[in-house]
Amino acid sequence: MYDANVSSYIGKLDELDAQYKSAVESFSKKTILFGDRFPFRYLVDDYGLNYYAAFVGCSAESEASFETISFLSKKTDELGLKSILTIEKSDKKIAKTIISNTRNKNQKTLEMDSLQSTTSKDAANGTTYLSVMQNNLNVLKEALQ
């Protein structure tokens, strides 16, 4: 039973991995921008994506400098990005400030879930690693358009 469950789960992980690879390959854009902390370094490295972020990793900082906001706003314009990414439970303040300093001021904020805030109640209600990463894939697809 254990071996069958492990094999089944590994198969689901492999399928999800293939979906990420296929999605990234299908878009000409390969850059995302996070107006927030950035806990997705391994994900972007694994799938060959470029990124810009207000903070490196899961920094404890909560206020981005003027220079950082200015740089990210210019990158958004330069790359023609239609969205700014945040993490779950973010106040989106930095992302909104970046957007307000872009040329068109019409980008969306999209949210990816790092799983760092997942509770036992979430798990009891059906939240799984696979379900969260599938939702993140859908967000990533929108961000790469």
Residue ranges of each PLM-predicted region?
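Extracytoplasmic metal-acquisition and chelation regions
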Residues: 1-145
